[in-house]
Structure formats: structure tokens, C-alpha cells
């Protein structure tokens, strides 16, 4: 009997979601943590179907706010991903305008998960077969559109969030990162594919 498992961890601020696909592969969306609990450390102790010997088949970073990448060093040390989805095209002046570039978390993220790291496209043949018709689709606003509609640097980063739709059997699960209402409205307006994924 095939099934999917979904964990939404209570990490206070930020986010950490884990998905076990029907074929047993692990996908993690964001790597937040609380003061006393690291979902990444726990996930690293569990059994998963390995993809090319990686326990973590895919890591999605919705947007680079520190609370969404708080546990990135643990990812590197204990649960390094085979592939990562993250924005490479952002205005980094805005991303770090609050001084977050001074944090070890942001420094580590930029050094280990930005080009030239993880910078080649993964071919379809090299992607995991999640199994049983399970589909993971991510959508985002173009950088200039996010800049245009956002009143503050923080809103800009939020509005660059990947919105991920999990489609499995009769379920549609939307994980929108921290996209703000004006960002979601703009994304729905410009992405027919996102509308279809939600409504199909």
C-alpha cells in the first residue's frame, strides 16, 4: 500500500516541512528550528530511500530569511541534499538589508548553497521517481515583479518565496513559504500552471 507522509514541525518562527514520497524519498521544505528542537537532526536519524546515496533527495528553500534557513549548518553536517531549489537571482542587498549577512547562518547558506555550489541543472533522468503519481511543483514570481509589488525589503524577500504544490491522489497541498497576499495575487494572475495545479 503506497502512501505519503507529511510532517509540519513546530519550530516557532520560520518553517520546516518534511515529506516522505510514496517511494520513500525525503523532501524537506525550509530548515527552521526552535531553540530546543532540530527537525533536521531528527530526520537524519530516520530511514529513507536513498537517492544516489543521499538521504535527502531534495531541499527547497522557499526564501532566504534567517528563520527559514536557521538549521542550514545541520543540513550540511547531517543531511546534505542531492538537489536544492532556491532563488539565485535575488537582490542580495535587499535580502541582507537587516544585517542578516552578519549571521553565521546566512554566511553558511551563501557559501555552501549559492553558485558555484549546486549550480548545475539536474536532468530528469537524475531526479528521484517519487512514486505512485506523486508530483511536487514549485512556482515563484519573477524577481522584478516581486520588487515592483513589495513595499519593504522584508516583503520583497517574502514575495520571492517558492509556492510548492504537492499533488497526490485526490490531495492538493499548498506550501506557500511566506509569500504575502499581494505576491500570491500576482503569482496566481501570471501562472496558469499554478492555477491548474490547485484546481485540477
Which residues are covered by each model-predicted region?
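Core dinuclear metal-dependent hydrolase active-site scaffold
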Residues: 1-54, 119-199
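Long, structured stretches of catalytic cores involved in phosphate-ester chemistry, encompassing
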Residues: 90, 95, 100, 193-200
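Short, aromatic/basic amphipathic alpha-helical patches
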Residues: 41-44, 96-115
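Proline-aspartate-enriched helix->loop->beta-strand connector
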Residues: 80-81, 200
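Short internal beta-strands
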Residues: 55, 82-92
Amino acid at each position: 500500500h503506497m502512501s505519503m507522509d507529511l510532517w509540519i514541525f513546530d519550530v516557532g518562527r520560520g518553517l520546516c516541512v518534511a515529506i516522505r514520497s510514496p517511494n520513500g524519498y525525503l523532501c524537506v521544505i525550509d530548515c527552521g528550528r526552535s531553540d530546543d528542537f532540530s527537525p533536521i537532526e531528527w530526520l537524519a536519524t530516520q530511514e529513507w530511500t536513498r537517492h544516489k546515496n543521499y538521504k535527502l533527495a531534495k531541499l527547497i528553500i522557499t526564501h532566504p530569511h534567517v528563520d527559514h534557513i536557521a538549521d542550514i549548518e545541520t543540513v550540511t553536517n547531517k543531511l546534505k541534499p542531492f538537489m536544492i531549489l532556491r532563488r539565485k537571482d535575488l537582490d542580495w542587498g535587499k535580502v541582507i538589508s537587516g544585517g542578516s549577512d552578519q549571521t553565521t547562518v546566512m554566511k553558511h547558506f551563501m557559501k555552501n548553497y549559492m553558485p558555484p555550489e549546486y549550480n548545475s541543472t539536474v536532468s530528469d533522468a537524475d531526479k528521484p521517481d517519487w512514486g505512485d503519481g506523486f508530483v511536487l511543483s514549485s512556482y515563484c514570481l519573477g524577481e522584478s515583479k516581486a520588487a515592483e509589488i513589495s513595499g519593504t525589503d522584508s516583503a520583497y524577500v517574502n514575495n520571492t518565496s517558492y509556492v510548492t504544490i504537492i499533488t497526490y491522489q485526490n490531495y492538493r497541498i499548498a506550501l506557500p513559504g511566506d509569500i504575502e497576499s499581494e505576491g500570491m495575487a500576482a503569482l496566481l494572475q501570471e501562472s496558469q500552471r499554478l492555477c491548474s495545479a490547485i484546481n485540477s
